[in-house]
A protein has these predicted regions:
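Eukaryote-skewed repeat-based solenoidal scaffolds used as protein-protein interaction platforms
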Residues: 2-201
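Long, ordered, amphipathic alpha-helical scaffolds
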Residues: 175, 179-265
């Protein structure tokens, strides 16, 4: 079975490379720009996973993740609707697709690099959850617990823009509790908060998010592991609830957990 799976993934790698080459060879017009490059960034992310999982080629995986991030940034900088700023949902998408994948692939230095670039590009910093989450993650990865606590407090308690305050407080709280659990070294609280995020986002799209928080949780767990929290203790129960996602949209996600090396490489 393992050999069949490997052969299947090797074939997938070949097919995705062919898709990438085909997309890159197309004549790009304004009308097709977004669709072509949106597909490219997903393919680069998938290739990053494949080369890491199949060949343990971390350098190539980093290259693919970096390319995916650059494509997203370039695409939205060309988009008239986003020319003035990188909005909240986009910042989240960039951080999720590149930073958290890099974390899970044991490349925290790349994760920090991507987070810093995306956070620096965002104008609406005081209101943006993903900016706060990115800065909090950077601080944790770099060992600055004092700064991390400050960002965590902001995620949990605001200040939030007045007209959005009730909704933002409700939406941010379970995410903030994950960071707080890491800072407190509390495995039980981490498990409770991660499951709360998973349950809250099962099959729904809240604040422009659908499956993104689930990948975000995997990145947070990787940070928790850096702080000595033994996340493998509840591994058998956790993924089943976390990865309850619409099969038609992201059926591959339920296999990602099996590829995560619980112990750092």
């Amino acid at each position: 079975m393992a050999q069949l799976t490997r052969e299947f993934l090797l074939q997938q790698e070949i097919e995705v490379v062919m898709e990438v080459e085909e997309s890159r060879s197309k004549t790009i017009t304004t009308k097709t720009y977004s669709s072509i490059f949106f597909g490219l960034q997903f393919n680069y992310i998938y290739l990053g996973w494949l080369v890491w999982y199949l060949h343990k080629d971390l350098e190539k995986a980093r290259d693919y993740l970096y390319l995916a991030t650059c494509i997203i940034l370039d695409m939205f900088q060309r988009d008239e609707q986003h020319e003035a700023e990188i909005g909240s949902s986009l910042l989240g998408l960039i951080n999720i697709h590149a930073s958290w994948h890099a974390l899970v692939a044991n490349a925290p230095d790349l994760a920090v690099e991507v987070m810093k670039k995306t956070c620096a590009s965002n104008i609406d910093q005081d209101k943006n959850f993903w900016w706060l989450a990115g800065e909090c993650s950077i601080a944790l990865i770099e060992g600055d617990e004092s700064a991390a606590q400050g960002y965590c407090n902001h995620i949990l308690n605001g200040p939030f823009p007045s007209r959005y305050a009730p909704t933002l407080r409700k939406n941010h709280e379970p995410f903030g509790k994950m960071f707080q659990a890491i800072l407190d070294g509390n495995l039980e609280a981490l498990e409770e908060s991660t499951l709360a995020v998973a349950r809250r986002n099962q099959g729904i799209n809240t604040d422009g998010m659908s499956f993104y928080p689930h990948i975000f949780v995997l990145g947070v767990l990787k940070i928790a592991q850096m702080y000595g929290l033994e996340i493998e203790k509840y591994k058998p129960r956790y993924p089943k609830e976390l990865l309850h996602l619409p099969k038609s949209d992201f059926s591959h996600i339920d296999r990602w957990w099996e590829r995560i090396e619980i112990h750092p490489a």
